[in-house]
């Protein structure tokens, strides 16, 4: 079954997203949002071509929106490798 792998930067992004959600909305909502992101990444690993081609970011890059965030990834042999998870208001060119 295809899966996803987070790079260290993507792990840091996810940690910051969850921490910010806890601060703003509480632990229960953070858990819901973490589960939403996990489910979306698992689905994206199964159907990696759902994402938009983003060779402007780096060769082989794709992006896909999840709620208020954009996942940047590339297709791997086992699913997807997630490079970053950025808020939709962030300029991706400043984070790669």
PLM region spans:
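Arg/Lys-rich, positively charged N-terminal/basic patches that mediate binding to nucleic acids
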Residues: 1-34
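Short, hydrophobic secondary-structure boundary micro-motifs
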Residues: 30, 52-54, 94
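Enriched for short, Lys/Arg-rich terminal
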Residues: 69-70, 74-96
